[in-house]
Amino acid sequence: MINRDNKKAITKKGMISNRLNKFSIRKYTVGTASILVGTTLIFGLGNQEAKAAENTSTENAKQDDATTSDNKEVVSETENNSTTENNSTNPIKKETNTDSQPEAKKESTSSSTQKQQNNVTATTETKPQNIEKENVKPSTDKTATEDTSVILEEKKAPNNTNNDVTTKPSTSEPSTSEIQTKPTTPQESTNIENSQPQPTPSKVDNQVTDATNPKEPVNVSKEELKNNPEKLKELVRNDSNTDHSTKPVATAPTSVAPKRVNAKMRFAVAQPAAVASNNVNDLIKVTKQTIKVGDGKDNVAAAHDGKDIEYDTEFTIDNKVKKGDTMTINYDKNVIPSDLTDKNDPIDITDPSGEVIAKGTFDKATKQITYTFTDYVDKYEDIKSRLTLYSYIDKKTVPNETSLNLTFATAGKETSQNVTVDYQDPMVHGDSNIQSIFTKLDEDKQTIEQQIYVNPLKKSATNTKVDIAGSQVDDYGNIKLGNGSTIIDQNTEIKVYKVNSDQQLPQSNRIYDFSQYEDVTSQFDNKKSFSNNVATLDFGDINSAYIIKVVSKYTPTSDGELDIAQGTSMRTTDKYGYYNYAGYSNFIVTSNDTGGGDGTVKPEEKLYKIGDYVWEDVDKDGVQGTDSKEKPMANVLVTLTYPDGTTKSVRTDANGHYEFGGLKDGETYTVKFETPTGYLPTKVNGTTDGEKDSNGSSVTVKINGKDDMSLDTGFYKEPKYNLGDYVWEDTNKDGIQDANEPGIKDVKVTLKDSTGKVIGTTTTDASGKYKFTDLDNGNYTVEFETPAGYTPTVKNTTADDKDSNGLTTTGVIKDADNMTLDRGFYKTPKYSLGDYVWYDSNKDGKQDSTEKGIKDVTVTLQNEKGEVIGTTKTDENGKYRFDNLDSGKYKVIFEKPAGLTQTVTNTTEDDKDADGGEVDVTITDHDDFTLDNGYFEEDTSDSDSDSDSDSDSDSDSDSDSDSDSDSDSDSDSDSDSDSDSDSDSDSDSDSDSDSDSDSDSDSDSDSDSDSDSDSDSDSDSDSDSDSDSDSDSDSDSDSDSDSDSDSDSDSDSDSDSDSDSDSDSDSDSDSDSDSDSDSDSDSDSDSDSDSDSDSDSDSDSDSDSDAGKHTPVKPMSTTKDHHNKAKALPETGSENNGSNNATLFGGLFAALGSLLLFGRRKKQNK
């Protein structure tokens, strides 16, 4: 900056702080990328110097001859918060602020400029001193940073300074806690790398970065490279030898050489094969991936300091890949390959000899590189590649400092790294605060865009002026020629935007959408001046932030390189009228050489080749041509390993020849030959003639200024052997092959290798012989399948050639056939099972000699799995049998014959008892004829009853019966009755009866009755019966009854019965009855009944009766079930109701007698 108010030395606390920031862009030469370095020069000493460990500041003053005799004491005053107002919580949260001690000046006093939040007292009457420049040792721990910091304060500004610029009043523009921009869609641009201040001597402010070769100049035009492929290869080879570390390059005394973008993008490879023109990510195997940020120590991406993000990936390419196939490399969405230019074309993948393996294209929208393979992959095999890609934080997607998880991917395989994004802070001195970066380089239009933040901390600044200089500036703000420049004149595009109080500026110092800010460019039409390649904008008094966008022209150097520098500074006056300066200088300098020289292209390096011959060494002597049957071997894989570990492979041609070219003198290579299947390597160095011998499977060779075509190797066919022998029937089961024992044919034999893989299957011939042929030396396993109907014999009982080896055995081939693997089997014996089913008449479960067998009983046989393997029926003697059974577990199931009942089981010995309906049995080397079963027939009933009954009964019965009965009755009755009766009856009966009866009856009755009866009966009967009965009765009854009964009966009965009975009854009754009665009856009844019934009844009966009867009846309580156990009925009422039951039975028999009498009389009448 030029001090136009006082061209002599500034004498009052005048210091300038310099910041040198670098800007990384990508420049493509010979398929590689170059870094263009930028630096920033800062005016206004600030606290930011503390961030760079090596930064120092120098305080200098020029003596003013006109004022040295007139110095007055300076009254020191405190300026509180001189650099902290409006920025305590702003995203631009750090200030670089430096203060100088006060120096005496004759005409004025002033307060000192202070460090942030500190008070400093100035002294007075200090003799002015000449400002001297101090050389500072350059910093080397920031790759592309070169900063110097100095502060200069000018003489009090003229009184009319405040009147030069009228500032637009702003409404409430306080400091805000963050600076933000509206989100914008990603756009492709090149990144600017700005670094924090580092001290350098003020006389050396340039940065030079070698983009291709740090040792020698390379002056080759793009046209020459296109027309000269060999020169292109040479440059790539030079690049592969370049030291790509991040250490500084020795150039100018204080320059620091940063890493080259994409300088490490080297690939070593060898060939694939696949399907044409498709993505083959699945055929790419990633072996290593790493992400490194800057120096890799703290993972901090200092986006304004030129710190790059380095992505290293190593991968192999499958041999299936073919020309035209593609693979992908993905950048993280928050990075870009370059943000100063739009040149994002990726480097081609080449091998160390310069052959192109794949060409890449970059998609800005997806941030993805697509590589398309050349015919290289059709010529070579086993390709291994390494790739190093550099990228930078995308300021569009990352506008403010933050933490990110960056993810990169090769062929879809991802790796991630956490990083912290750090942006620069404004330079601050007093109320002056400013920062700037280069944002876009257009090499076609030869323009550079710079964006400047003016007063980003929104301080209240007075007499504000901003200078934009087309060069760097020195410590005093004077233009410094050389080391880059731009053209600043009336044709320079300068736009000014005002930031409202509610808007926040992005910390990235990069604006993509200016429409969100107020365009106030027109307000500076009369407040903008140009002079000596400097534009000055007069802002006047401000308390808002502003953005200046400058698009200036530049002139490339004669060799087409870029020497671009542009500075900007802000000056304001403090309350005493003294100027405070703060500023930046941005510059880009590129060069393709750093070591000097005449700029001519280095003579092309001579390259060499190696190779020769692979042959079949029939006589195994290791010497070519000693046997007429020897011939070349085609399609043998030969792999070359480069000194850096990368490889490529070729196959021998039809003549057995191979060759590798493009090899460098003095370097050591390794050649490996893959042993073809079915061959073995021959003898090594079988002769002293290096042109005729075999060098073995692997040979190392060093290039000594000439080709080496003597690297040969020979192979011979591996001999083959047989394995096998014999499978025989071991009739005596001794495990030894006897002369009279025959072979077994069609036995399956399986051969497996040492890994268990089946390599052959065969069957024995008619003699029991088998053989496997064409086998190599090694261990094998033989498995014999047991033939149907045979059992394996004992093994290993005698010598190998005569014994049995077992179902699975191991055989070893060692330079000879192995015909000792035998196996013996004997026929498996069969067994029978069965016995007898009989009629167990006495139901004791034992087979008695008098009991007979039951024929046609179905018997089923099941195996252990429950599968039916046989069904038969017993013969006329009750016998059954199953034959041809193996040892094992079985189940025998007997089907019960109709009408018969299963007898009791397991009552005696197995061969005489009954085993039940289902029997489990195990056969172990013998027959089993003990599986028997017995059945018996249920009993029937025969009853003969003769009853003569004379009964006079007066009965009062009270019965409570609950009965559940299901009854099925079929009755056929034929009755012929002739009755003459005269009856006079006076009966008074009170009966309460509730009856539920279900009856099915078929009755045919013909009755002729003449009755004369005189009966006087007074009966009061109240009967309540609740009966619950469940009865299953099967009865066959033949009854012949003759009864003569004279009875006078008066009975009143009330019964409530609920009965469920299942009864099957077949009754044939013939009754002949002749009855004449008027009377008084005396009844004697004798009944013998045998009944099997199951009944449950609850009965309550109260009876008053006078009767005489004799009834021998089996009590119901002694009725038995099918287990022959007494089954008692539940008690219902009093136990002395026997007489009541007798009366009821007496009445029943009297009625039966009358029926018989009537029938007899009728017959007599007939």
From Swiss-Prot:
Pfam families: Big_8, Gram_pos_anchor, SdrD_B, SdrG_C_C, YSIRK_signal. Keywords: Calcium, Cell wall, Peptidoglycan-anchor, Repeat, Secreted, Signal, Virulence. Induction: Expressed at both exponential and stationary phases. Residues 1133-1166 form a propeptide. Residues 54-230, 904-1141 are annotated as: Disordered. Residues 53-606 are annotated as: Ligand binding A region. GO terms for cellular component: extracellular region. A motif (YSIRK-G/S signaling motif) lies at residues 23-34. A motif (LPXTG sorting signal) lies at residues 1129-1133. A combined vaccine containing IsdA, IsdB, SdrD and SdrE afforded significant protection in mice against a lethal challenge with S.aureus Newman or any of the clinical isolates NRS252, N315, NRS248, USA100 and USA400. The immune response elicited by the combined vaccine is greater than the one elicited by its individual components. InterPro entries: Adhesin_Fg-bd_dom_2, Adhesion_dom_sf, Fibrogen-bd_dom1, Ig-like_fold, LPXTG_anchor, SDr-like, Sdr_B, SDR_Ig. Residues 77-90, 166-178 have a biased composition (Low complexity). Residues 908-918, 935-1105 have a biased composition (Acidic residues). Residues 61-75, 92-108, 130-145, 221-230 have a biased composition (Basic and acidic residues). It is found in: Secreted, Cell wall. Residues 118-129, 179-212 have a biased composition (Polar residues). Cell surface-associated calcium-binding protein which plays an important role in adhesion and pathogenesis. Contributes to the resistance to killing by innate immune components in blood and thus attenuates bacterial clearance by interacting with host complement factor H/CFAH and modulating its activity. Inhibits also bacterial opsonization and killing by interacting with host complement regulator C4BPA and thus inhibiting classical complement pathway activation. Belongs to the serine-aspartate repeat-containing protein (SDr) family. This is Serine-aspartate repeat-containing protein E. It comes from Staphylococcus aureus (strain Newman). The lineage of its organism: Bacteria, Bacillati, Bacillota, Bacilli, Bacillales. The gene is sdrE.
